[in-house]
Structures are given as C-alpha cells and as structure tokens.
Amino acid sequence: MRNASRRRLSLLLLFIFVNCAPSIALGQDRIRIGVPLFPTVSYPVFIAQEKGFFDKNGLKGEIIRINSEPTTYQALISGDIDATSGAPTGLVQSNIQGVPVVSLGSWDNLVSYTMITREKIDDLAQLRGKKVGINRLGGKSSLVLRVMLEDAGLNTSKDVTLLQLGGSQERLAALIRGGIDAAPVDFAFEPKMKQMGFHLVPGRKTPFMNGPITVTVASLKANRGKWLRFVKAYLEATQYMTTNKEGSIEVLKRIVPADDKETLDHAYEQMRARATVDLIPPEAAVENLVKMMTYVDKRAATVDRSKLADYSILRELAQSKAATKK
C-alpha cells in the first residue's frame, strides 16, 4: 500500500514537472546586466525590462547599477553579472589584456557629451587657445573630450588648456565666474544649460561606440540561445523607443534625475535621433573608441577589431525577419 502510494506520488510529481517545466525554465532564465550609475546609455535595457520585452522572450532581467567600468568588467569576468550595457572602454581594455569579451551590438554610437561655453562659438575648432574644464585627466569624460577635440582638428596638448576641476557643480561654478571658457556636459542637460545662459556648441556629433552590449566569449558559446533571445528583446526595445514617445518617457523618468517636461522631452528626442536601430555601429564609431583607449594604453592601436564584436546573432535575426516577410 505504502509503495503504491509512493508510486502514485512520483507519477504525479513527474506529470507536474513535465507539464510545467517549460514555463518555469523560461521564467527562471535570468540575465544580470551591469549598467552605469547614470544609465541613459543603457536606455533600451530599462525599456526591455519595464515594457515586457524580456518577459516576452523568456528572460528575467536584473539591472545592476555599478559605479565604474573597471568594477563592471571585474563583475562580468567573475560571473557576478552576465552582460554589460554602456561600458565601452572595458571592451577594448579586456581584449588588450587577453580576456575574451565581445560586443553583441551597440544602440548608441555617438559621444554623449555636448560642449557648453560662456561665449557663443560656431564649432569646436574655435576653442583653440581656450580653457576647458574636466573632471580629471585620464577619466572617461576627459578621454572622450580628447576624441571630440581631435575630431575637430585640435591638439589637446597644444591648442587648449585642460583644467581638472572635479564634478559638474565645480565646472559650472568655474564657468560662471570665468575661470574656464568651456566644459563638456551630458546631452540630457542641454535645456538646463541654456536656461542658465550658457551656449551649446553646434555641429555634428563625433562617432563613438558608446552603448555596446558586452558578454564573455565563453558565455556566448555556452548560452547562445539565451543571448539570441536577449538581443531580440534589445532590438525590440530599441525599436519601441524610437516609435513610442509616451511609453518611452515613462521609463526615462526613472533614469534621468529631472522632473521637468522640457528636459525629459529633450533627452528622449536626442536618444531617439541617435539610436542605431539595427545595433551595428559604424566603423568610425569603433575606431574612435579604439583611438580613445590608445591614450591610456598604446597597445590598443594593435587590438584585433574582429575580436571586439560578434554580430552573428544580429545577422541571424535579420535573416529570420527577412524570411518571414517573404
């Protein structure tokens, strides 16, 4: 009697497992994504999370804000997170050091900074002979600024004076009192800078791979199906972001420290306009990222570009989409 009861219980548990396992497995397929503390560059990740694109593709996303890129890549390599979004410098640095990580795609491929000035100028080249405030030499913002200025034909060692002033509040204070002539600011805060009486330098944005999705090569090989679903969700979120303003701004309110409509509308329109919807960055954007890294490590100049990215999932999804339309 007891053995028969055990057999019936075993059969019941087997029935429950067989019939419920697929949905449980999908629900438990977790992906932990490391993003910056100020994560506008990871915008599609938040949209995928909050608008159900991860759920739709059988994923449970866990977004983790991390305060520096070195810490982000330490977490990626150790397995504490599964992917990074919007942390480009470690992609090159890791490959220089022989650690195989790759980008699966990048939605944002322009520098995220705008130059603000006390006096109105027409382009960055007119900063020749001027003082520019930065956080610190060697920091990411100063390195990106160097790419921007060199793209405009300026030599940062000779043509401008870079002054280390600390954070944004210190740079703004220096601008107000005339201690510097210009400073970089995140594009999301352009309206506030205008309200304060500063001028925004017009002109084209410098190409720069700013928003890569980065994973370890080992994880990509071992979990390709999961990463295919992740990239699909990311593509869908990016498309949603470019076509659904109201829903996208709902998400943006949670990641941009601003509550006024003008700032939020401006930030959204900027991100919509700069989005690379197919996630494949222009060659110039990749080259400027590599160029930036040569400022801190000369070995970056010889890094194998083919090892920085694997777009095979993007190509597979594009082919599948094209076949469906036929």
Regions found by a protein language model. Name each.
Residues 89-90, 162, 169-257:
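Pocket-lining segment of extracytoplasmic ligand-binding domains
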Residues 290, 294-326:
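Conserved C-terminal helix/tail region of periplasmic/extracytoplasmic solute-binding proteins
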Residues 46, 92, 146, 191, ...:
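Predominant activation on well-ordered alpha-helical scaffold segments within soluble catalytic domains
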